[in-house]
Amino acid sequence: MSVIKMTDLDLAGKRVFIRADLNVPVKDGKVTSDARIRASLPTIELALKQGAKVMVTSHLGRPTEGEYNEEFSLLPVVNYLKDKLSNPVRLVKDYLDGVDVAEGELVVLENVRFNKGEKKDDETLSKKYAALCDVFVMDAFGTAHRAQASTHGIGKFADVACAGPLLAAELDALGKALKEPARPMVAIVGGSKVSTKLTVLDSLSKIADQLIVGGGIANTFIAAQGHDVGKSLYEADLVDEAKRLLTTCNIPVPSDVRVATEFSETAPATLKSVNDVKADEQILDIGDASAQELAEILKNAKTILWNGPVGVFEFPNFRKGTEIVANAIADSEAFSIAGGGDTLAAIDLFGIADKISYISTGGGAFLEFVEGKALPAVAMLEERAKK
C-alpha cells in the first residue's frame, strides 16, 4: 500500500483537518464507550505536539442530513476530549465558510452529517472542506469504505492528503491477518445484520479454516437446519444461502440456546435445546454447550478474526455466550483481530482489551476489507500519493 503517511510530514504551523472516527455511543449526553476516541487520541496529540492548527471531525449517528439535531451533536465527544487533553478544545457549529484555529488549539468541527451533500460525496462541499486546510488526514478506517465528502471528496482537492497513524496501522494489521495467516485460522461473524454479512462469510470461507456464526446470523443457520426459530431475528430469504454455506464449509450451528418471549433487558432467559424453541419464543443467546464447543475451537486457533457478538450481550441474562467466547479469544495464544462497534463494546464490558492483539475501529470497512473490496478512501490516498 503506497500512501503518504501523516508521520512523514512536518505539520508545524499547518492547518490540519483530521477526519477521525468519533462515532461513539452516547447516553444522557455522556459517551458510554470511548474505544474509538481513545484510538484517535494519539493522532490528534501528535498533530498538536507538532504545532499544527488542528481541526478534527466525524459523523455521529444517523441524523437527517443537512439538519442540525442536538441529539447527534459532537458535544459529548468535545467534553470527553477536554478531560483528556491539556490543550484548549472547542466545538464549532458553522465552519464551511472558514474557521480560525490557533496553533496548539483543537477545534472540533460539528457532525459532518449536518452538512447537505456529505453522504453523496458532493463536490462543492468537498471543496469547502478542502479550503479549510493545508493537510487532510484520513484517519477514520471505520468509514474508509464510504465515498463521502469528508472521507473521500476532500482528499481529492486538499493540497496534501495522507493516511493518519491509526488508518495506516489498521491496514497493516488486517493485511497480516488476511494475507498470510498463521493456521488454523478461525473467523467469527456475529451480530444482527445478516444480509450484509453473508457475502463476508462467503469470502472468509475461502480463507479461514473454521467459521463461527453468532447472533441473528446463527438463527438463519439454525433455520437452515430445519429447526423452528419462533420469533427470532433471522432472514428467511437467506436460508438457502445458509444451506449452501453449510455444505461447503465447516460451520458449527448451536445445539442449545437461551430464549425469551420478549426482547427486553428484564426478560428471563430459558436454556433449551435448539429442537425445542416454541413459536412465541426468540433466541437471544447461544447455550452453554454451544459456547463451550466454540471456546474449544478458539483455544486451538493460531489466527482469530472476530466481528460481532454471539448473543444480545447488552442484556445481562443473554450475555453468557458472548462472555465465554470473548474470554476464550482473550486466553488464546492466537494473533487476534477484533472489529465492529458491538464487538468493541463487548471487549470493553469484559475488560479484555489488553488481551486482543489488534482492535480495529472499523465495522463495515473491516468487513469490506476482509471481502477484498477496494476501500474508496484508501484508493483516493493511493492516487494522491502518485502525484
Swiss-Prot record:
Keywords: Acetylation, ATP-binding, Cytoplasm, Glycolysis, Kinase, Nucleotide-binding, Transferase. Its EC number is 2.7.2.3. Transmembrane segments: none annotated. Pathway: Carbohydrate degradation; glycolysis; pyruvate from D-glyceraldehyde 3-phosphate: step 2/5. GO terms for molecular function: ADP binding; ATP binding; phosphoglycerate kinase activity. The keyword Cell membrane does not apply. It catalyses: (2R)-3-phosphoglycerate + ATP = (2R)-3-phospho-glyceroyl phosphate + ADP. It comes from the Bacteria. SUPFAM superfamilies: Phosphoglycerate kinase (SSF53748). The keyword Nucleotide-binding applies. One of its GO terms (biological process) is gluconeogenesis. Substrate binds at D21, L22, N23, R36, H59, L60, G61, R62, R113, R146. It is an enzyme of class 2 (transferase). The modification N6-acetyllysine is found at K84. It is found in: Cytoplasm. Its main location: cytoplasm. ATP binds at K197, E314, G340, G341, D342, T343. GO terms for cellular component: cytosol. Belongs to the phosphoglycerate kinase family. HAMAP family: Phosphoglyc_kinase. Monomer. PANTHER family: PHOSPHOGLYCERATE KINASE (PTHR11406), PHOSPHOGLYCERATE KINASE 1, CHLOROPLASTIC-RELATED (PTHR11406:SF23). This is Phosphoglycerate kinase. It comes from Shigella dysenteriae serotype 1 (strain Sd197).
